[in-house]
Amino acid sequence: MKLIIFTGLVLFAIVSLIEAQAENERACLPQYQVCTDAPGNCCSNLVCDCYGRYKSGTRIGRNCFCLQKGVIYKREN
């Protein structure tokens, strides 16, 4: 009985380790890629930065991109 419980715990630990490793190996989104639907998938040196789109004062959508952390982007006229 103890052997069955021990074997079950070992198998559970192995499966958990495999799942954690697969989570860490998922592909990250590179710079300037759209991250609207996946805000946590930008690569480690990037952050998912979102901007609202407006037309005549009414919000018509939202865009999110993987951008460098700490960088401020300004509109050029």
From Swiss-Prot:
Tissue: Expressed by the venom gland.
Cellular compartment(s): Secreted
Protein's UniProt keywords contain Membrane: no
Signal peptide range: 1-20
Domain of life: Eukaryota
Record keywords, A-Z: Disulfide bond, Secreted, Signal, Toxin
CC annotations in GO: extracellular region
Post-translational modification: Contains 4 disulfide bonds.
Proregion span(s): 21-26
Keyword RNA-binding set for record: no
Gene Ontology molecular function, alphabetical: toxin activity
Protein family: Belongs to the neurotoxin 19 (CSTX) family. 08 (U8-Lctx) subfamily.
Protein name, entry field: U8-lycotoxin-Ls1s
Source lineage: Eukaryota, Metazoa, Ecdysozoa, Arthropoda, Chelicerata
